Amino acid sequence: MQTTSDVLIIGGGIIGLAIAVELKLKQKRLQVTVLSRDFAQAASHAAAGMLAPHAEQIAPGPMLDLCLASRWRYGEWVEKLEQLTGMETGYNPCGILSPVFEAPHGNSSTNSAWLDQETIRYYQPGLGEDVIGGWWHPDDGQVDNRKLVSALRQAAQSLGVQIQEGVTVQAIAQRHGQVTAVLTDQGSFQADSYVLANGSWAKELLPLPVFPVKGQMMALRMPAGTHQPYPLQRVLFGPQTYLVPRRDGRLIVGATSEQVDWQPHNTPQGIQTLLGRAIRLFPALGDWAIEDFWWGFRPGTPDEQPFLGYGPCDNLILAIGHYRNGILLAPITAALISDLILDQKVSPLIHAFSPQRFLTTTNPPVLSCRPMTAVFPSIANPSLPHAAENSEGSKDLLEIAGRKFHSRLMTGTGKYPSLTTMQESVASSGCQIVTVAVRRVQTNAPGHEGLAEAIDWSTIWMLPNTAGCQTAEEAIRVARLGREMAKLLGQEDNNFIKLEVIPDTQYLLPDPIGTLEAAEQLVKEGFAVLPYINADPLLAKRLEEVGCATVMPLGSPIGSGQGIRNAANIGIIIENAKVPVVVDAGIGTPSEAAQAMEMGADAVLINSAIAMAANPVAMAQAMGMATQAGRLAYLSGRMPIKAKANASSPLTGLVG
């Protein structure tokens, strides 16, 4: 079987159907075909239909702009669908109430209002005892996602879209930068333009950082009240859970967020988690009838933002990775992608979501995907020795989580005057581990644009870090993104994470409780955790016991250049640790780096002292030499300290 169309869309969920409908509305004679693996498995079914950019607390930037633009279109968009099909979509711009259990740090958004404990309970009686207030987001709303997808499917068919159900795409055939055909279990399909909109399954066809995030959900039946139809009248978006009342008396409870690959089915643990969170938010629902529960796979990406725009071939367009916002972003995605296909019109909204954003840089790319070696080769720098030798003459290698390194100096990538200076400094230092702030790289923060691609990751081991995370939950989420970022850059087996949980914005001191909590979870998930901590011997021991690969006590506050102010505690940590000890933060001079190594530290991590030096490249070399000298001195053993002088030459048998 061979079928030819003007546009072939791979994926029959809400995004694929929305694009198909938009194309046909703009150009009726266009031949559009949609290939759907299994309509029932679409991520659209594993959703609650919330239109909630403010309740989701999406940070200001391109993603929020995209979400707001889509929400603004929603009323007109669903009205058009309802007119086409005569079907309801359940669209309701009802506003969303966001109860909280802890006092907020600042305003949620300019369009949102804070409600104190008394006021929020007036708005919605029956909230749990732990609720201390909440935000009212008047512009957010909801839609019945199942009704919406059914209406889209009906609209597509009525407009003449050919929907091929039960078709599994096996490969995308390419030649000379063009897709020539899509190969499936039911034959080949050809078209002038192709759209990849198959969510989590995209990575099976192209090497894209899209992965399944399992979500479990359930529905309860609300009892009808005497004076009001149902006891819960408002959408509640609480901490880690949401409750969405439908007009037919159902209450949608969601959702878990689990990176368990393709593990199917609802689980007792998942349902227990849902119920526990929901009952804490609204206790009365603990007595309501369970009507249904289900699960599905949301398409996640390393930065939790979609891929929109041209793919690796000129006639292939991507519309994938919408994660938690597929329902919300359907109208704007359909508009942007249809404009791209029909008019080659690239909206400013789409630029930040280019599929190339993880792979492009204004600097010459040095990205390599060659296999990583078990022992990293020494960087070519004739000024530095490869590694110290112990008394038996064998190489003295640094070993972390089973991986061996010649260099004991780790460096960072921030604060450099330019990307070129950073590249030259890394090379000059002789280091083999470079830490990268996941959040800043993913958001292209100032000074971090193109940073991930500026380093040859075939010779440098990436150490993703969770800088900027104030809670354990944040750090765990960012660690997972860091692992995916490392995979994308060719280090498929990189499970390292430098764990930073820092709520203190003045002194940047790490939170010991949050660090321990995050470390325990990340170790369970298979990470090699390198935790940044205060020089606390008891905490260091506890982190070692939960399975951390190293401990990284600070010498003094980050970026202070104060040197090692807590040598006694670091010495205790070194004496008792059975994992490598890395002195991290505060080192300002090569002599201080050597001091840490002479104390018996296994490695040092130095960034600011190099990046902020008058000559960073020369300082990087000096730090590398000092690290080697300090290690060699430690292995050699210093002379005993004596109370009295002892001349180097004998005092007897002198001439004359």
UniProtKB/Swiss-Prot annotation:
Its EC number is 1.4.3.19, 2.8.1.10. FAD binds at residues 7-21, 48-50, 169, 322-328. Residues 396-656 are annotated as: ThiG. Glycine binds at residues 56, 298, 324. 1-deoxy-D-xylulose 5-phosphate binds at residues 559, 585-586, 607-608. Residues 1-395 are annotated as: ThiO. Keywords: Cytoplasm, FAD, Flavoprotein, Multifunctional enzyme, Oxidoreductase, Schiff base, Thiamine biosynthesis, Transferase. It comes from the Bacteria. Gene3D superfamilies: Aldolase class I, D-Amino Acid Oxidase, subunit A, domain 2, FAD/NAD(P)-binding domain. Pathway: Cofactor biosynthesis; thiamine diphosphate biosynthesis. In the N-terminal section; belongs to the DAO family. ThiO subfamily. Catalyzes the FAD-dependent oxidative deamination of glycine. Is essential for thiamine biosynthesis since the oxidation of glycine catalyzed by ThiO generates the glycine imine intermediate (dehydroglycine) required for the biosynthesis of the thiazole ring of thiamine pyrophosphate. Catalyzes the rearrangement of 1-deoxy-D-xylulose 5-phosphate (DXP) to produce the thiazole phosphate moiety of thiamine. Sulfur is provided by the thiocarboxylate moiety of the carrier protein ThiS. In vitro, sulfur can be provided by H(2)S. NCBIfam families: thiamin_ThiO. HAMAP family: ThiG. This is Bifunctional protein ThiO/ThiG. The lineage of its organism: Bacteria, Bacillati, Cyanobacteriota, Cyanophyceae, Synechococcales.
